[in-house]
Amino acid sequence: MLPKMQPSAQCLIVFSLAFVLGWYVLRPGNTSCVLLITGESVRLVNCELTKDLVEAVLLRPLKHL
């Protein structure tokens, strides 16, 4: 069984894990592109602004439903 940990240590572990996962997803060498859709907006996250992407957005802008 695992020993009990202090709440501050648990908090540090959780924030460290979130930071590492966030860094992995948003690192410069990552080629994935994420479309984040919320009730307020539509965002492209971690995408390179290539000429093709800019032309696609200009030709067919994203609309709210």
Curated annotation (Swiss-Prot):
Its main location: host cell. Residues 1-6 are lumenal. InterPro entries: TGBp3. It comes from the Viruses. Coiled coil: none annotated. Pfam families: TGBp3. The chain crosses the membrane at residues 7-26. Signal peptide: none annotated. GO terms for cellular component: host cell endoplasmic reticulum membrane; membrane. It is found in: Host endoplasmic reticulum membrane. Residues 27-65 are cytoplasmic. GO terms for biological process: transport of virus in host, cell to cell. Keywords: Host endoplasmic reticulum, Host membrane, Membrane, Transmembrane, Transmembrane helix, Transport, Viral movement protein. TGBp1, TGBp2 and TGBp3 seem to act together for cell-to-cell propagation. TGBp1 is the main movement protein that physically cross the plasmodesma with the viral genome. TGBp2 and TGBp3 would facilitate TGBp1 function. Belongs to the Tymovirales TGBp3 protein family. Plays a role in viral cell-to-cell propagation, by facilitating genome transport to neighboring plant cells through plasmosdesmata. May induce the formation of granular vesicles derived from the Endoplasmic reticulum, which align on actin filaments. This is Movement protein TGBp3. It comes from Potato virus S (strain Peruvian).
